[in-house]
Design a protein with these regions (language model features):
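Periplasmic-binding protein-like
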Residues: 123-131, 177, 194, 198-238, ...
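Ligand-binding clefts/hinges and TM-proximal coupling segments of bilobed small-molecule sensing domains
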Residues: 155-172, 209, 239-268
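Acidic, polar ligand-binding/catalytic clefts
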Residues: 70, 74, 79-142, 211
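Extracytoplasmic small-molecule ligand-binding "clamshell" domains
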Residues: 27-105
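Short helix-initiation/N-cap motifs at beta->coil->alpha
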Residues: 66, 82-92, 135, 154-155, ...
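A ligand-binding cleft/hinge motif common to bilobed small-molecule-binding domains
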Residues: 89-92, 105-114, 159-162, 183-215
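Extended ligand-binding regions for polar small-molecule ligands
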Residues: 66-75, 141, 146-147, 154-155, ...
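N-terminal export signals
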Residues: 5-24
Length: 268
């Protein structure tokens, strides 16, 4: 080691020495142990984003996100209790401790990483546009002056604002309200996750998806900062599901096709 390297190493040592202490302060008590002691996992989900989260014909919570969280709870060894969240409420509810984790079609972004942590990616989707079948709109280039609705507090809202700055964008609290605006003719376009838009188009005649994918949206399970125990539990669950074939089965049941992006499996 030359003199310059020795000087740089010496200068870094005080900073490096503080890292374990900072990490310990963020981690706090073992959250998984707390969940076991409580006897249930408290999970935040949406009920208005099929096939990720919705209420079935019997008014029971269902969906891909919920099935992932049921598997996490089984991995920990407790039942799961679902709490309805919105794009606006999901992070505050997580940070306040009202829920242990959240899977609500939430995109993993650098901005959100300043506030919360994420599991590994469990689904990769993208943003698109839904319009009436007789609409002349074919893509973002046609949106100037058009009434566009989107879900509030999402990356979708930011993306459409950037790609179509001259559109008349209105943000709604949830997908159902945004969809209703389109269905009733109070909007020209609904922009959102492609898979969710496909669900609306499939269940309601007279609408079509246009414009291709506007973005790539990696979904992750949201966790409190430094909650390594819960992050490990979620990541282990996802990898075990992939290896056993359970993930592919759930995916095909929800989306009607095999997974497009594999879950990364780490060596034991």
């Amino acid at each position: 080691m030359n003199r310059r390297s020795m000087m740089m190493t010496a200068a870094l040592l005080p900073a490096l020495a503080t890292i374990p202490h900072a990490a310990s302060a963020q981690c706090g008590p073992d959250s998984v142990a707390q969940v076991k002691a409580r006897g249930k996992l408290l999970a935040g989900v949406k009920f208005d984003t099929p096939p990720f989260g919705f209420l079935d014909d019997n008014n029971n919570p269902a969906g891909f996100d919920l099935d992932i969280l049921r598997a996490v709870a089984a991995h920990i060894g407790v039942p799961v209790e679902f709490t309805k969240v919105t794009s606006v409420s999901r992070v505050p509810l997580l940070l306040s401790g009202n829920i242990d984790l959240v899977a609500a079609s939430m995109t993993h972004t650098r901005e959100r990483e300043r506030t919360i942590d994420f599991s590994m990616t469990y689904y990769t989707g993208g943003q698109s546009l839904l319009v009436a079948k007789n609409s002349p709109i074919t893509g973002v280039g046609d949106l100037a002056g058009k009434r566009v609705v989107v879900q509030q507090g999402t990356t979708l809202e930011k993306t459409i604002g950037r790609l179509a700055p001259d559109a008349r964008v209105t943000a709604f609290r949830d997908y159902d309200a945004a969809w209703l605006a389109l269905a009733q003719g109070r909007a020209d376009v609904l922009t959102g996750s492609l898979t969710i838009l496909q669900g609306f188009a499939k269940n309601n005649g007279g609408f079509k998806i246009v414009g291709g994918l506007l973005s790539s949206e990696p979904f992750g399970v949201g966790l409190r900062k430094g909650d390594w125990a819960m992050r490990d539990a979620v990541n282990e669950t996802l990898q075990d599901m992939w290896t056993a074939g359970a993930y592919a089965k759930l995916y095909e049941g929800a989306f009607g096709s095999p997974p497009t992006t594999p879950i990364e499996v780490w060596p034991a």
